[in-house]
Amino acid sequence: MIGKRINLTAVELTNNFSKYYLKFAFRITKVEGKSAFTDFGGTECLRDYLSRMVLRRVRRIDTVQDLVTSDKRKIRVKGLGVTGRRVKSSIQVKISNKIKDMLKSIVETSTLEEFVDGMISDEIKSSILREVRSIYPLRNFEVRKTEIIP
């Protein structure tokens, strides 16, 4: 039983139906009687939700980073930005670099719990959309996956 992975949706955890597309993973670390204690394992967006974001004649901008939170937890953060239409590759690179810089500063100044709370409350999403707008307006941004690195 120890080490088993449990997946739950954000709706089951928070009763927030606007986050229907977000799945949480937990790993069982300890069992006492009928109670199981878990540790956070990561998040993931549903493929259906991501494929609805990325349509024809838009640009998908993916970022992948290995970062360390302020409570010394190593996580891999995968972001997805979507532009409203096709853009030059130089603009894509600038957007990607800006997203990476912002995610790095957000993760390194917050604990894992604060980072996940920011994902659920859309604070991270709105701040990145606001900052990247100076380069090129994004249609949408989402942290599509987070993983705990052992």
Where are the regions a protein language model picked out?
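Hydrophobic-cavity lipid-handling domains and compact docking modules
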Residues: 1-87
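Positively charged, low-complexity, intrinsically disordered RNA-binding extensions
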Residues: 93-150
